Amino acid sequence: MQYTQQAAAVTAEVNKAVQGKQQTVNTIWMAMLAGGHVLIEDIPGVGKTTLALAFARALDLKESRVQFTPDVLPSDLVGFSVYQKETGKFVYHAGAVMCNLFLGDEINRTSSRTQSALLEVMEEGTVTVDGVTRPVPAPFTVIATQNPIGAAGTQMLPQSQLDRFMVCAVMGYPDEEAELAILAGQSKGRLLDRVRPVAGQADLLAMQQEVSTVFVHELMYRYIVALAQASRKDPRLAVGLSPRATLALTSMTRAAAYLAGRDFVAPQDVTAVFDVVARHRLVLNDQARAGGETVDSVMQDLLRTVPRPRPEKADRHGR
């Protein structure tokens, strides 16, 4: 694993701008290494945007940011064509997603039509304007933030779009020491200005390639599928984990193993990332919600009741 030290340097650099959020930083970094997209859900003012911009700086990525409001149009994201009389041709003007890291702030404040414009980009890595399909630059990651449902001016993202985010991370308030560090650091200048590039686009692509080669034993595949099957049969859930979710869980476990310095996935990798992969995909039914159940309690039950493979069976030589 040639780039593991450089991968660790990225998180160290991002942590300069975001105090006390190591777990959230690791979650986003694993999703980027796995080639996925990230949804960050929390109240305003806890550092969601700063965190995304810190990754763009640490990785020297071309970033673009859109503050989603009801008047943002799909063409603002994917671009548009303009007819030029001089040449008699249509000229394409790139939209905001033509970048390496696209930050969509408060995605659940915009229209469903504009939200849907992200679907092709997130799933296919392309945009289609006037019948012409164009690839987005590689690497490409969407980091979207949303305020909790019920906040003024918000609307629920459709389940089809939620499922396209590999993970959903929650920031939460900083603890007392972290908040004091934020105040002390801010007095010496913007925390984001401390972040320096420690890798580039080519390095990220190389890391993603290394992550894709991390070995997954058949027993680990069976464990992941068993968790998904159990979620679909759980009487408390109206929606369980989709096949796309099992693919996301597998990719995230590879990234977790990679950051741990292993070339194979172990059972602890699955349990470490299960909540961030599953939380936004599982939907409680009305009866469970009325009974006080939570998605978190269901996830804990799934991890407790589905048998885990023995760790020694997980490597390349396991039987």
Annotate each predicted stretch with a short phrase:
Residues 42, 105-106, 117:
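Walker B catalytic acidic pair
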Residues 32-69:
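Walker A/P-loop
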